Amino acid sequence: MSNSNRKEITGLNRMTPKGLKELCKKDKLYQTPRLNDVLYLHYQGFQCIESLEEYTELKCLWLECNAISEIQGLEKLSKLKCLFLQNNLITKIENLDPCRELDTLNLSSNHIRKIQNIGTNVLPVLNTLTISSNYLKDSESLSDLIQCKTLSVLDLSNNRIDDILIVKIFEQMLNLKVLVLQGNPVVSRLPQYRKTLILACKELTYLDSRPVFPRDRACAEAWKRDGYEGERKENNRWNRAERRKTRESINCTIRMRNSHRPPDQQDPLLRSSDSEDDTCAETARKKVALENGCVDDLWEEVSGEQPISEDGTNSSSSLEDNDGTSSQDDLIAEKLSNRRTLEGRPTVLYETEVSNVKSANNDINIFEEGVGKASQIIIEDKPVTKIKLINEPSCMNDKSAMNCTSMGPVVKENDFDEDAEIKNVDDMVPCQNLIKSNEDINSEFGFSSKLKQDFDQTCTALRNDAECKEFDEELTIKESESKPFNEMYDIFAAEDDKLNETLDLNLNETTCPHHVHDNFFSEQNKMPSFYEEDIMINLLPKTKEKTLLEKDSIIENEKCAHDLDEMGRQMEEDLAELRQSTQNLIGISIDETARTDSETDEEDLIAQQDPYSPLLKQQFKDRRMKIMLTEETKAQEESLSDRNIALSNESDQDDKQDQLFAKILDDATENIPKRIFGTGCDALSSVWPQEECLLQLTLPENKESPAQEDTFKKSITNSTSFEKANEICVRMDQKMAEEEEALGKLLHDLEGEINNVYDINTKVKYEENTSTNESDAVSICTSLLDDIIVGLTFDEVLCHEKPKSFEFGLIESDEEFSYSFEPKLEKLVPPALEDPARGKSLRECLDTFSDFVSSMADPKLPVMLGRNPTSGVEKIRAAQELLKTKNLSDLYKDTAESLNSQVAKEIEKRKRRVAASATRCFNQRDKYDDTLELVENRLMIVKKDSGDLEELPPPPPLISDTESEDDNPTEDNYTPGNEVHRHGTKTQDSKEHLMSNLLNQNQDDIIEGKKNDSAEDEFYSLEAMTTFGNLDAEFFQKLDLQKVNASEDSEPAINCMRSYNELQAYMKSGSLNTQLNSEEAEMLQTMCSRVASDVDKPKSQNSKEEEEDDLLKKMVLRMKEYEEREHQLQLISHETSSELGPIKLSIGGSKLFEQNTKIPESVLVHSENEPTRNNKPINTKNTNDKESSDIMEKNGDPSVTTSFKTSHKSIDDDIQSDVSTDYESGEEVVVVEPPTLSEAVLKSFYSDEFEADSKMVHELEEATRRNLRRYNPNIMHISTSNHPFSTNNILPTKTSTSELSEGAKAKWAKIAERLHEFLDPETIANLNKEQFGESDECEDSQDDNITDITVEETNLKKDTKLVVLEEYNNTHTCDGNSCPSKLDDSDQFASLKGFEKIKETPTHNMGLSSVMSASQNKTSETLPNEIGNKITDFSSFKTSSTDLINSEGVKTEQIQCNLQILSDEGDVVVEELSVNAQVSSFK
């Protein structure tokens, strides 16, 4: 089974038409191959490309993660655009000629060593090539990339390219925009890798992991030109530009904020703090000033920086001045470093400077009133010492007001449809509000002569500038400098003409004559004093330095001329916008003749100022004609209206005139181009997109009457004519019917052609009236039925039975993915075995499979496949269901921050705890650094610094790893010192006095320990014990007990140490015969009496404890009787000991011999009331330690020691308890405590002799095992009915009779015949060679029921002390008087905990003593059988030849043995066998 699965998983597949259709069905693609444009064939194990001839319309083919080694089979895929072949075995790029439209090719993770056959002649439109993780190495392997003229994305990452000549290849790829080279050695070999590639690839926009920004390219070019210093300067220039942009945006925000604040609460604007900017600006200013001092003034005027006026009103500079000053240095540095054309427009060109909003509004309104009253506007000429445009405002409120005024709707002709209108209602609202506010203030303020004076100065300056264009001198430096100014002044003259025309339009209705144009240019021949000072002829020879300086000045002047030219164009556009806004505010005057002349003049001006855009000029003309027609219609309607309406219109025109004048003044002070949207605010207007230009100059909002709409719009039909509408509907219906008929015919032809080759389902859908052709329905149904019949025939062959019925799903079109419903057939595999391993353990999978095999082998058996899962599986499934519940989100309410805070708190708490522990340890270490000396026969601590004497600290209490869960008050009173470690001592004086002194000293130490501070108590922890163990060892090395003077205080400690040394000597010698003298016997008798007195004391009112106390009392009485019998048994053991016979082979756990015993009903009833106990043995090491402390001797026999302990029910009875915490004694025993020494000291003493102890225990264990194998032929037969323990604790002591031996051998012969069925021959041979006595431990480990010998051997291995317990021996001959007297107490004693069996243990020197097992009881129902099983197992294995057989009768029974054969790992049951046998037993 595993081989077939492995072959199926690792085997390669082939592309077949049937398999491809199945994949299309799985991916919900069309079943007709040529209808698919995408095909997913990845992760299929294909080894070659084939069977794709029918998929002619494919545009995207996925073939990654297969085993394809060659590119082939693509001859018919002429429309393929994307081919994905990554993660294959391709070694060469070939056979791509048919795919002429291939755009994307992915060949990553293959074995390609050279790029070839992908040039423009093969793949003319290849755009993306991904060939990462291959074997490309040098420039030769990449040389063919030069032929890829259209390749723009190239991924060469994670190859082996190390040739730096690849840069030349990339340099010849003109369209390369994205390049990935990371993961190649060449990246580290190329010096300045990123800059080199940026310079080599002119169109590169993305390199490796990040884009190539314009800044990166500029820095790379500077690095190539001027080295690292040039790169640094270029980088600083970009940084300054970014800082300036940020500063300007912040200043703009501050200005907007200040516009809503009073003057005293306004924030200052940010100034440039870059010293380098200031230095560059100063240097540039000095250079220009050397040749022409007026250049600085010109730059100041262009950038908006004005000096303080000679008038006294503008002595304090405004916030706008500060902004202009702060940006001037940066602007000059930027322009000089770039040496490029001036981009963008100045943010502020013309601003007026007045004191505040109140004075500005006052001047405007008074000036408008003066215009209405005056009959003529006279502009006087005044001498001006310097070119001065219009001063800046001193307050932000003025600027905001003017901005609102200038943001009105502006008209510009465009190429939209005639009916297109762009309405800018939002911009009209602030303008109307401003006009109204100006009208309200008109009556409150008077005329100001200051504003008129400024206006006159401006006009004079413009006139003087216009006269400069007539200068005609030789081509000198001065002439080159004056050339750009002349051009600018020409533009100014054109602007003045436009302004005059605007004034003519505005004041046409008034009768006041005016001649603005003549006044502007009345002094054309006058030479301005501005240039008189500069025109000087220098006849002196020029030096080389001066010549170079003049050349630089010429370059700067040319740059300024170009910039001024750009500004002139901007002014033209701004004036055109101003003109359009003026027309929107005033409209067309009543005098049509004058209006026509003004329009003609405007056209001439537009032709002069915008000669570069004839398209816009034509659009202006068309739009103007439309507006004229509209206004003519309005004029005709107005002539038919009332005279009152006409008068009101005239008053409205007067209001419009006032509004116009205010608008003119505001626009004259701020002439900012009104750009509404779009990025690149620093771009020239000449390069604006056409769509953006059309949206910048919005159309006015004109409310047209229905008559006007009829002029430009003509409805298709008459809404009141039903006949015409019906006729149109009929015509449209006919047209749709014809189209539908033609389409139906075309579809019919296509279906007829397709159905001849393929079987398809077609359903044509229409949203409106439809008609379908179903002429081929018969052929389609026939083909479907044929497919179904073939499938049914195949299923019938597999299932050997015909299905009863089939449900046909909906026949869908290819658009809806055909065959969406699978036929409901009977499944070959049962549902329980579809996915046997999901959510199941290995054992459950094997059980399910075995149930399936059994159900297939014998159909009559009940089906077991639906059995309930085990508890472990139920927990897993419950956890999976819990994960799917909706309430699970409540468990994840804790955010990452809260969890991190909790973790931080826990870490901090742990650190504090560790710090406190370390502090305590080091505090105690300071004490141990002091010296130890004997003062008056007492061990004292002498302080190093002061010399003071201190007592030794009390010994640390025993700290256990686990805690007992029993609520037993006696365990709380237990202390580690309450143990007696006396295995044997020599004769010593006053033992009773020694024990009492030790007890008193321990109590005193405990009292003194309680009085110590908390630091002393906390010191006794596990960490401190391990830390200062070496210090304790050093202390005891200094202590020499032989040199200590004997006294009352030191005598207990010295005696204790001597007793310990004597004990070690006894254990080394291996002697087990420990004789006690009279003093020791009296001491033990006293201890027994104390125990009895303690038992008599009532400890609690609990009924269970009282019952246990009664049992203990009875145990004490019985043990006295046991001691007498044991003394007699010791005499018999020497006579009847003999060697054990050979041991035969047995199979673990099988029951071959059973001896039924008669158990009184009272015992069974009493045992049913006992708590259920586990069959595992108690920790024998702890048990023996406890038993050794409870020695009781009543008869004075020095060779017999006994111990009793009751076990309380615990929750963790099945878990082996810890040695230091398994204290379950229910009685209070008087104990003798050792001297108050630390545990580390005792450990050091104990570890010194540990190896000797282990050796002694091993020898005792071997001696005990030899005694167990001895054969006792002369054991007396005793009736089991006369002994109180005959029911549960009978041990066989005599070998069976010859008939029983022959019967057992016959049964074993039958079993041995079948051993080869479940054991291999090698194992059987090893078992036959091995003696049972040698493999005793191995067989015991396989046995389910632990035998008595196993318990004894485990006790001897785990303990370092030999504990001999008394037990019954059934071979002892009881007289008739003593045995019946003990029958009354047999029931009670049989129910005691801890006494389940009694075994005999013959020894070599001591005689026969027995070891009592303290194992736990089983349930009350199986108690008799359990005892019987253990007895029979012991006898069947022939581990003892002293079996006691009751010869009253023989019982033959039929028994069954279940055997489980495990796998090699021992965790899976491979086979289960059942063995039947007949067993004869004696009654």
From Swiss-Prot:
The keyword Repeat applies. The keyword RNA-binding does not apply. InterPro entries: Cilia_flagella_integrity (IPR050576), Leu-rich_rpt (IPR001611), LRR_dom_sf (IPR032675). One of its GO terms (biological process) is chemical synaptic transmission. It holds the Pfam family LRR_9. GO terms for cellular component: axoneme; synapse. Residues 311-327 have a biased composition (Polar residues). Its main location: other. Residues 249-282, 300-327, 945-986, 1167-1213 are annotated as: Disordered. Keywords: Cell projection, Cilium, Leucine-rich repeat, Repeat. It is found in: Cell projection, Cilium. LRR repeats lie at residues 34-56, 57-78, 79-100, 101-122, 125-146, 150-171. Residues 185-223 form the LRRCT domain. Residues 1183-1196 have a biased composition (Basic and acidic residues). GO terms for molecular function: dynein complex binding. Belongs to the DNAAF1 family. Cilium-specific protein required for cilia structures. PANTHER family: LEUCINE-RICH REPEAT-CONTAINING PROTEIN 46, PROTEIN PHOSPHATASE 1 REGULATORY SUBUNIT SDS22-RELATED. This is Dynein axonemal assembly factor 1 homolog. It comes from Drosophila melanogaster.
